[in-house]
Amino acid sequence: MKKNPSRNVHFSKGPSKLLDKINVSIDVDQRLFKEDIAGSIAHAKMLGKQKIITKRDSEKLVSGLRSIQTDIKRNKVKFSRKLEDIHMNIESLLFKKVGKVAEKLHTARSRNDQVVTDLKLWIKNNSIELDKELKIFQKTLINVSKKNVYTIMPGYTHLQVAQPITLAHHLLAYIEMIGRDRSRLKDCLYRLDENPLGSAALAGTSYPIDRLYTTKELGFREPTKNAMDSV
């Protein structure tokens, strides 16, 4: 039986088929491919800028990652369940593109800060898109309300007819509800807008990284202040 290094210390036997099935997340997290690649590109560029790796290796990594992103968008990539998640899949693809240089991408980076960065970017990007859709929905309700200022309908309370109201009054109530939801999204985006990349596995790294650089590259407002809190 081929041993898994991550399990050697505590387990003498391999995992059950059920556990392997549970651990496979590629069916879900493949949607993170753009964010995972964006984080890796920013990190690779920073490693080159800081001379932690050579400029040539940095450029090779960036080129390989961009090529992978293009392949995925063109549906040329079939993700492997054997590689469990999007991170391992992209790393495997990168190794095929650029060879052993791919191993340098994890210099000064852990899977911990990588995953948190991916998730923050994904939620941030999708929250922005969701807010745009909610704004369109509000405008649609307002337009319908303007046409129904004098349209009478029954108003209900406790599942019983209570008062005559207008359709406009009813629809405009949803404008307020959606407005509160958009305010929550705005607050969520503010809290998300901190870059955890560089926190590494737990308490940062001894490499001379530049977190302000990756923060700007990824479009975050600022880097997180405490590595342990970040991951």
PLM regions with names:
Residues T224-V231:
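Short, intrinsically disordered, charge-balanced linker/junction segments flanking boundaries
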